[in-house]
Amino acid sequence: MIEKCIGAHRFRRLQRFMRQGKVTILCLVLTVIVLRGTIGAGKFGTPEKDIEEIREHFFYTRKRGEPHRVLVEVSSKTTSSEDGGNGGNSYETFDINKLFVDEGDEEKSRDRTNKPYSLGPKISDWDEQRRDWLKQNPSFPNFVAPNKPRVLLVTGSAPKPCENPVGDHYLLKSIKNKIDYCRIHGIEIFYNMALLDAEMAGFWAKLPLIRKLLLSHPEIEFLWWMDSDAMFTDMVFELPWERYKDYNLVMHGWNEMVYDQKNWIGLNTGSFLLRNSQWSLDLLDAWAPMGPKGKIREEAGKVLTRELKDRPAFEADDQSAMVYLLATEREKWGGKVYLESGYYLHGYWGILVDRYEEMIENHKPGFGDHRWPLVTHFVGCKPCGKFGDYPVERCLRQMDRAFNFGDNQILQMYGFTHKSLGSRRVKPTRNQTDRPLDAKDEFGLLHPPFKAAKLSTTTT
């Protein structure tokens, strides 16, 4: 009927259009079904609800994506900041100063206008207190053998790292050197890194520490102070303890330079022995008043420069104060002070280090004097500071030589030596053997007689 009305050709076109329309409608239905499954069409499935939920879905997706991008950006920035600012896993790029920011402002100097500085409460009966303690604690004798006092070697460094990149490495070498000597000679060692009194910084920091250790360790007969820039270079030399039986303070120095000339370098306080006694506590009390930093130390420095021979103008230091104290009050203190010049309790590095090869060729360790110095002290090098009084390269090379000079005496016990005094590398000095106890200990350091315990030996 329709074909007759519109014609055969148009009828076929209409049929084709209807077939295509069915396919289009079918695709549309399938699309809606898929969208309803993925996006959702609400509880009722109405067109209005479909449109509303589609709109909410895309709004939620956009809203959720924005904070995600923010988090990604913040995370990226944080990672970048950690890697760049703090160094991440790299010690090389990490700013070490962040770890050493002081917890608070430095302690302010107290007003000393009317009251002199004191190291602590006045003690007047220390000899009696100590004697009673030793009687009550016989297992901690102050002498470990006849003429062999119990000795505590004390040294230390600042709480913070050195101000130059290699300073801490040389501090490590220095303490290793001291540990070696103390182990061989049966000496206890204490390494300090705490500033016990902020007023007594710098040269003077040792005084509060020394007093505290004397009072805390009554079993110690002698305290041996040694600066961190001093090294043992004669590992064999044993101090002549018998020589000091009537003395309480032993320092490297010369009577004429201290008492007659009042020369500020007439003695050295970088390495000295102090007996644990009431006399020593009184000396520390008399020594300390020039130490507080600030105006007191500055004014005291002017007095010392005026009174002592050849002293430059700078704030009061512990060495100049000791020279001044002994020179002006010799009757009170001089009788118990031994100024040692028979060996190098302190040896100035500038006149010693270049002669090490000559010493090796002509002498052996055990003298402690100019032939083989007990201590080589690098005065003025200041290996932990920013600036020294001598060229840095010269100081560091000479410190390496001094360390190796002493270290060779340790290594020889085990059959090794440094290839040269300037070399870190070592070489064997003897062949290995299946009878190691037959190996020769050239300097007698493996089992020195002064370390032998008076005990019976049992074997199983």
From Swiss-Prot:
Its cofactor is Mn(2+). It catalyses: Transfers an alpha-D-xylosyl residue from UDP-D-xylose to a glucose residue in xyloglucan, forming an alpha-(1->6)-D-xylosyl-D-glucose linkage. It comes from the Eukaryota. UDP-alpha-D-xylose binds at G156, D227, S228, D229, H377, G380, K382. Mn(2+) binds at D227, D229, H377. Residues 1-20 are cytoplasmic. GO terms for cellular component: cytosol; endosome; Golgi apparatus; Golgi medial cisterna; Golgi membrane; trans-Golgi network. It is found in: Golgi apparatus membrane. Changing D229N: Reduces activity 2-fold. Residues 41-460 are lumenal. Substrate binds at H346, K382, D389, Y390. InterPro entries: Glyco_trans_34, Nucleotide-diphossugar_trans. Its main location: Golgi. Binds 1 Mn(2+) ion per subunit. One of its GO terms (molecular function) is UDP-xylosyltransferase activity. Pfam families: Glyco_transf_34 (PF05637). Changing D318A: Reduces activity 40-fold. PANTHER family: XYLOGLUCAN 6-XYLOSYLTRANSFERASE 1 (PTHR31311:SF19), XYLOGLUCAN 6-XYLOSYLTRANSFERASE 5-RELATED-RELATED (PTHR31311). This is Xyloglucan 6-xylosyltransferase 1. It comes from Arabidopsis thaliana (Mouse-ear cress). The lineage of its organism: Eukaryota, Viridiplantae, Streptophyta, Embryophyta, Tracheophyta. The gene is XXT1.
